[in-house]
């Protein structure tokens, strides 16, 4: 049995206003070929299928076109869970129809833990694999707010809720497995931030919950999970040094900070040891680059030298340029655009640190929204309105709660008498 673990497609994502439809299409075409080549039986996509809870028609077309074609590769089952960027109701809406294609979608946490336990069968109808399809767990799914509770109380209850949810789903899987003639491997999924997880600058990874204590440790996953397929972090990595708990990472670089990162997916097979336990054998499958990204920094001569070298290579490259020279170059954009004119290079972003430093010295900050995240914008507002520093922590925490509420809201859900 061959299982392929991927995540964080972020279909519909742009890069500084540049659409990436061709990249996504190329990846999905390559993925179909990969599924055929490696005779994949089960494909697991661990959340953030889309980049937004209201995906555009082009992103939807890519998604459904892929699902319509994947059956022809010989892949018997596709398991998709919702991530924090996804709309649970949007993913779940066609779940009944997709089930007829052996595509199993769990967009949000279920009331009954057993409803998240998928028993997958082989071509002969024999049980082959159990998947505990745990999606991104929203605050409202696992914690009841109480008046007067402190920040640390909220964070602790959140962690307890995550642990309790996984424990309940794990117990349900063990019950199902115990009822089979022969036990089968158990895979758990999740879209979560593991403690110690590695991120990179500009990857767009959002905080999932208010506060940092909700970074879970490997011990949150039940011992019955023979492999844990995680999503949310874009860097391929193990969790807590445990080989069987992994982030596959995103298939495309989500920002220039990931430009030099080798993207991959996890090919998982199971062996049985002397004690009868299922042991995952994991191979990383490298993903090719569909659109080269390059980050260039240095003085103006250094930048120009590198740009000329890239022009000579003739490869299509998207660029981020960081000017760090000491000389003030007010027409940097014009000079660089002239240098790459008519070439295969496209400069998507230029950061002129010398101009920014000069502006700071003149007390005229030249920051743009591209340079700041949501929290930093709020911090600038506090400073601009001369809010006393003694009030900053409480206001920042309240603002984080507002952001968490907005990001966690399902924009595609309909309000029908309180039902979504």
State the predicted function of each range:
Residues 1-68, 75, 401, 409, ...:
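N-terminal active-site segment of His-dependent metallophosphoesterases
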Residues 194-269:
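Conserved beta-sheet core of the metallophosphoesterase superfamily
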Residues 10, 40-58, 75-89, 194-205, ...:
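Active-site neighborhood of divalent metal-dependent phosphoester/pyrophosphate hydrolases
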Residues 15-16, 49-67, 82-101, 106-107, ...:
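Metal-dependent catalytic neighborhoods of phosphoester/phosphodiester hydrolases
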């Amino acid at each position: 049995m061959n299982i392929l673990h991927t995540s964080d497609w972020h279909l519909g994502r742009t890069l500084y206003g540049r659409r990436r439809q061709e990249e996504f299409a190329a990846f999905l075409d390559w993925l179909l070929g990969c599924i055929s080549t490696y005779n994949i039986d089960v494909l697991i996509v661990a959340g953030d299928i889309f980049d937004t809870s209201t995906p555009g028609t082009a992103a939807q077309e890519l998604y459904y076109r892929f699902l319509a074609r994947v059956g022809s590769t010989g892949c018997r089952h596709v398991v998709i869970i919702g991530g924090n960027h996804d709309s649970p109701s949007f993913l779940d809406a066609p779940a009944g129809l997709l089930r007829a294609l052996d595509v199993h979608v769990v967009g949000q946490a279920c009331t009954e833990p057993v409803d998240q336990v998928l028993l997958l069968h082989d071509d002969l109808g024999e049980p082959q694999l159990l998947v505990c399809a745990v999606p991104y767990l929203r605050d409202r799914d696992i914690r009841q707010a109480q008046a007067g509770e402190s920040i640390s109380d909220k964070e602790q209850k959140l962690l307890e809720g995550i642990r309790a949810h996984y424990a309940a789903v794990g117990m349900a899987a063990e019950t199902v497995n115990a009822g089979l003639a022969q036990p089968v491997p158990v895979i758990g999924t999740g879209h979560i931030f593991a403690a110690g997880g590695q991120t990179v600058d500009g990857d767009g990874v959002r905080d999932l919950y208010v506060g940092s204590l909700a970074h879970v440790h490997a011990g949150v996953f039940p011992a019955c999970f023979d492999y844990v397929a995680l999503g949310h972090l874009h860097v391929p990595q193990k969790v807590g040094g445990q080989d069987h708990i992994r982030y596959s990472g995103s298939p495309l670089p989500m920002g220039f900070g990931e430009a030099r990162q080798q993207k991959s997916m996890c090919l998982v097979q199971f062996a049985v040891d002397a004690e009868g336990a299922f042991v995952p054998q994991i191979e990383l499958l490298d993903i090719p680059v569909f659109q080269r990204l390059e980050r260039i920094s240095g003085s103006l001569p250094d930048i120009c030298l590198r740009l000329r070298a890239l022009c000579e290579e003739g490869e299509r490259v998207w660029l981020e340029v960081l000017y760090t020279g000491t000389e003030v170059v007010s027409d940097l954009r014009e000079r660089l655009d002239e240098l790459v004119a008519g070439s295969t290079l496209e400069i998507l972003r230029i950061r002129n640190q010398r101009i920014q430093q000069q502006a700071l010295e003149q007390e005229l900050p030249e920051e743009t929204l591209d340079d700041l995240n949501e929290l930093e914008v709020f911090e600038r507002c506090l400073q601009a309105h001369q809010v006393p520093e003694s009030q900053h922590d409480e206001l920042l925490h309240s603002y984080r709660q507002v952001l968490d509420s907005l990001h966690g809201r399902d924009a595609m859900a309909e309000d029908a008498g309180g039902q979504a």
